[in-house]
Structure formats: C-alpha cells, structure tokens
Amino acid sequence: MAAVAHLAAHPELPRPTLRVGFTPDEEVGEGATLFDVEGFGAVCAYTLDGSQPGELQDETFTGVQVTLTIDGVDVHTGWATGKLVNAARLAARVLAALPADTLTPETTSGREGFVHPFEVRASAGHAVVRMTVRDFEEDRLEQHVELVRRTAEEVVGAEPRARLGFEVQRQYPNMRDHLRDYPEVVSRAERALRAEGIEPVRIPIRGGTDGSVLSARGLPTPNLFTGGHEYHSVREWASLQDMASAAAVVVHLAEAWAAR
C-alpha cells in the first residue's frame, strides 16, 4: 500500500495500468482459489511474500496434503482382551515406521522434499493423521506419497479388523512449470531490484505462495521479498527498512513495465 500511495501522490512517475489485489486466505492454501483472474485484467502479477531483500522467486514446491483415517474397534477396557483394536496405537506405529533421519523438514534443505505429519487426532476407536508432502519434482512427490500409502497399508493391514482411509488433496503446483514461458516477467523484476541497488537473489521457495495457483490459472506471478523473517513461528518479525525497500522495488517495477 505504501507503493500504491507513493504512485498516487506522484502521477508524473511512469507506470502502466496497475491492478492491486489482496488474498486473505493464503496461509490456509485458499488465497487464490477463487481469485477472479479474468476480472483482475492483468497480463502478469507479483506477490510480495518473500523474506530477505533481493529475493525473486519463480519456483516453489509442489504441495499436497495426505490425510489418513484409521478406524479401530473400541470396547470397554475391562473386557477388551482379544477384542480392542486401538486406532491411536496404529496411528503411532504408522508415524514410527516413516523415515525420521531423512525426508523430514528438519533433515532436508535446498531442493530436497519431505513428508511432514503436522496433526494427529486420535482415540481408541478412530484416528486422523494429516501430513504435508512437498517436492520440487512431480515424480519425486509421487514417490513420497506412495511411501506414506505403502507404510500405512502395511501397518494397518497387519490388523484385519482395522480400516484405513487414504486421501490426497492437491494444494499448489510448482510455479516454475507455468512461468518458464514468461521470462520477461522475471527479467523486469530483476531490473526493478537493481534499480533499487539490490542484486536479485534467485532461490526456490521451500513452500508455496498464491503465485503458484495464480500462475497455474494463467496469470504468471513470481514472488518478491517483503522483509519478513521467522515465518510461522512465535518469533515472526519484519524489518521496517526492508519493507520500505520492497515498496520502492514495486515503484521501480511499475516503471519497468511502463517502458514495455
């Protein structure tokens, strides 16, 4: 909004026709699902969802959510001998059977993907385990999902009275596959960064942004920095100086597209 206010206050600054959009549900993966791309009327867009100054990102994880449901047999513990099938224990065994020294967020970096159990709700009779599965390459992502499926089927299948449900929900695609046909969108962002005296930092996002979904829907949308740090933690913070730099880059970006 600082960039928009600056452009509004300085009509002499060159700019093309600009559109500004806000997506309130980005953190739950729904920020761009219902975004009116056609009504927005832009040829390209840029999200401001990065961290360090200079970040310019045109590649993300492909993300899916895997949900396991396990139904056991819940009976009174006083006469449970030979009858009780504890869904909570089965869920724990599935998690224990997954890799712990590899293929986790805390043991991977760079271009490595992972499987991340983030929620477990369990009782003796019913358990739900939710996991995020991430990778930059579709074939490797499918391998990770298959590993989870096979592990769950082996563990739960060892108890014939238990029942397993397995659901895979697509969350966002790697925007690289949709941006590679629009190199000008990225090169003009590089020009805007350098106009602010910042050298572009090209690193893939170990996560996703609304630009992933928007790019897949036909609106090429790379990501720029905002100066935020320690995202998704209780220590999340932002640098005011970096935020000001991000706003200045947006102004330079408008100028870069005005010269189209």
Residue ranges and their predicted role:
Residues A87-R260:
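Metal-dependent amide/peptide-bond hydrolase catalytic core
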Residues Q57-T69, R191, P222:
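Acidic-glycine-rich active-site phosphate/pyrophosphate-binding loop
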Residues D36-F40, T62-G63, V85-N86, E146-R150:
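Short, solvent-exposed amphipathic alpha-helical segments in soluble enzyme
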Residues L56-D58, G78-T81, P204:
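Short histidine-centered beta-strand/loop micro-motifs
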Residues Q52-E55, H76, E230-H232:
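Short gly/pro/ser/thr-enriched loop/turn and capping motifs at secondary-structure boundaries
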Residues M1-E27, V66-I70, H76, T81-D101, ...:
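Alpha-helical metal-binding/catalytic segments enriched in His/Glu/Asp
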Residues M1-F61, L103-T104, T108-S109, F114-F118, ...:
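Acidic/histidine-rich catalytic neighborhood of metal-dependent amide-processing enzymes
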Residues L18-R19, V43-Y46, V66-T67, V201, ...:
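Structural motif
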